[in-house]
């Protein structure tokens, strides 16, 4: 046993971490929680700053010993270090920079847009008690009350269209995976975009390489295993408040 | 002769992160200073290096790198010299968690305040037509919006209040972390400290009511310890404005 993973449905950050753990053969004790019901804020989980102030919002929590860790890309880096499966980060420093810069783009631009659109389409019913972060609590309130700003939603759809274009361009040289070899960048990009096919269909009307990439991804045993943990028919339609949209615009 | 060039502004915020990492690592580099307040970063010769027009950028041979925190990880991995990420995978995770928290939550709040009190007033006296032309040259729409807001002093009271709320909380979080550990992410000095110092070195001056020897002794200990490092002195010597000179306040003894 190498840790306890509290996770939601295999969508968004919970997907990234589950799939990374399976890719790396890390045997975690999985404790599924209902992120949409606010389980992450219950007393059953530890609440250090790294859990309560995670930039990611309602993401998974990995507890190793007395340390509770959050933020899916960095959890995947950790799993890459401790697991025995094939590497999910490039070894070359420049290739690794490319992967981390790509993930930063997804974290900062794509994830907030996807979370905003996902929550607007499937709002949570109530704001859970016990949210320590006032700004996360405000995102919950906005989501529950359907207060999404029309300008922000339009901008979010643009961000999804741009992300699909960026992936399509990245795959233009015929490569199978975003960084050449399969990596965390593939998992994190898919994690946030899987649910966007239904919500921003216009992004996918001319994206044959993205379509083939997604099919390759879904065919990976670890990805199938992660998606197979869903307890609902469409896990990509399940959203809880995620990272905030950049306050600078 | 070096094959590393860093395009940067002051040793401060994002520019200072790869600068200080290179100094700590002992990597010689060509320093290419861009005057942010003169919009050097949006001129064609720099856009040829980084089409997004963001600072900093680094070239290593024919490789071009952007995103200051990602550049720091590259500097740590690509060159010999002292290790700037902890060896333990959990500590590495913590270093990355803190850098993301600083980059995406605390730094934008500090910079909103900094832009409204420093950057905006500094460029506002320029010719309006010239300013407008300079803003039109900015490649990223998000940055155009931010510059317009800074120049026009158009951050709303709600935005400023929220930024000040986050600064207050963030100082508390930093102090709490530094009560637990000698350095921000682990028992070793590293990239999280370099990142944090670039954000926090002037806090005792800009937020004296929140950050001082009485209220935040561990932040003050941490800032003074980083200031005492030769790499920090060398790095801040590249500063050209009063912004970088604020670091001298760390010469004071604990009260």
What are these regions (language model features)?
Chain A
Residues 230-249:
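Acidic/histidine-enriched, glycine/proline-rich intrinsically disordered or flexible terminal extensions
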Residues 1-137, 244-245:
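GST-like domain detector, emphasizing the conserved glutathione-binding G-site
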């Amino acid at each position: 046993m190498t840790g306890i993973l509290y996770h939601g449905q295999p969508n968004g950050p919970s997907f990234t971490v589950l799939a990374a753990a399976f890719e790396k053969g890390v045997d975690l004790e999985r404790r599924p929680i209902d992120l949409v019901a606010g389980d992450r804020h219950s007393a059953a989980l530890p609440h250090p700053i790294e859990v309560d102030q995670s930039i990611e919002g309602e993401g998974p929590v990995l507890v190793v010993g007395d340390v509770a860790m959050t933020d899916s890309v960095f959890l995947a880096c950790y799993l890459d270090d401790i697991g025995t499966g094939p590497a999910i980060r490039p070894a070359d420093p420049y290739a690794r920079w490319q992967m981390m810069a790509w993930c930063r783009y997804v974290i900062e631009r794509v994830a907030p847009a996807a979370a905003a659109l996902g929550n607007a389409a499937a709002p949570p019913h109530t704001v859970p008690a016990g949210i320590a972060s006032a700004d996360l609590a405000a995102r919950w309130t906005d989501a529950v009350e359907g207060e999404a700003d029309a300008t922000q939603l339009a901008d979010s759809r643009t961000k999804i269209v741009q992300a699909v274009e960026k992936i399509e361009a990245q795959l233009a040289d015929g490569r199978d995976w975003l960084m050449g070899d399969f990596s965390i960048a593939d998992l994190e990009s898919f994690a946030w975009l899987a649910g966007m096919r239904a919500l921003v269909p216009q992004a996918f009307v001319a994206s044959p390489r993205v379509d083939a990439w997604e099919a390759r991804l879904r065919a990976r045993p670890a990805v199938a295993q992660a998606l197979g943990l869903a307890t609902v028919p469409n896990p990509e339609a399940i959203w809880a408040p995620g990272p905030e949209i950049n306050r600078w615009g | 002769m070096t094959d590393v060039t860093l395009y940067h502004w002051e040793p401060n915020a994002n520019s200072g992160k790869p600068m200080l990492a290179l100094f700590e690592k002992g990597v010689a580099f060509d320093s290419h200073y861009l005057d942010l307040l003169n919009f050097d970063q949006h001129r064609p010769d720099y856009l040829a290096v980084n089409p997004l027009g963001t600072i900093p950028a680094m070239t290593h041979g024919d490789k071009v790198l952007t995103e200051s925190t990602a550049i720091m990880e590259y500097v740590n991995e690509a060159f010999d010299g002292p290790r700037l990420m902890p060896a333990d995978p959990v500590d590495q995770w913590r270093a990355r968690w803190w850098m993301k928290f600083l980059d995406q939550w605390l730094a934008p709040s500090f910079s909103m305040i900094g832009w409204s009190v420093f950057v905006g007033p500094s460029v506002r006296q320029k010719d309006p037509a010239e300013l407008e032309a300079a803003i039109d040259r900015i490649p990223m729409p998000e940055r155009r919006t931010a510059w317009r807001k800074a120049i026009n002093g158009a951050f709303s009271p709600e935005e400023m209040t929220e930024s000040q709320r986050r600064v207050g909380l963030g100082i508390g979080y930093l102090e709490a972390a530094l009560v637990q550990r000698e350095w921000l992410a682990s028992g070793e000095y590293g990239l999280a400290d370099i990142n944090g110092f670039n954000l926090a070195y002037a806090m005792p001056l800009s937020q004296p009511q929140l950050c001082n020897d009485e209220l935040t002794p561990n932040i003050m200990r941490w800032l003074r310890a980083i200031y005492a490092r030769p790499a920090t002195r060398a790095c801040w010597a590249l500063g050209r404005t009063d912004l970088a000179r604020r670091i001298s306040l760390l010469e004071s003894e604990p009260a």
